[in-house]
Amino acid sequence: MATVKVTLVKSLNGRLANHKACVKGLGLRRINHTVEVQDTPENRGMINKAYYLLRVEG
């Protein structure tokens, strides 16, 4: 299955709780932390919900 690189580029301070939960669910912990996640509908949904905090490649 294809993978997607996701990087947290903005702080989580003051963000909605469900957006923080989506970022945590993707495995991101701090700014400029990058993870590779599988390109599934579940992960795409989390990325789309918190898109303004993330940079997505691939």
From Swiss-Prot:
Keywords: Ribonucleoprotein, Ribosomal protein. The keyword Phosphoprotein does not apply. One of its GO terms (molecular function) is structural constituent of ribosome. Pfam families: Ribosomal_L30. One of its GO terms (cellular component) is cytosolic large ribosomal subunit. SUPFAM superfamilies: Ribosomal protein L30p/L7e. InterPro entries: Ribo_uL30_ferredoxin-like_sf, Ribosomal_uL30_bac-type, Ribosomal_uL30_ferredoxin-like. GO terms for biological process: translation. Belongs to the universal ribosomal protein uL30 family. Part of the 50S ribosomal subunit. This is Large ribosomal subunit protein uL30. The lineage of its organism: Bacteria, Pseudomonadati, Pseudomonadota, Gammaproteobacteria, Pseudomonadales.
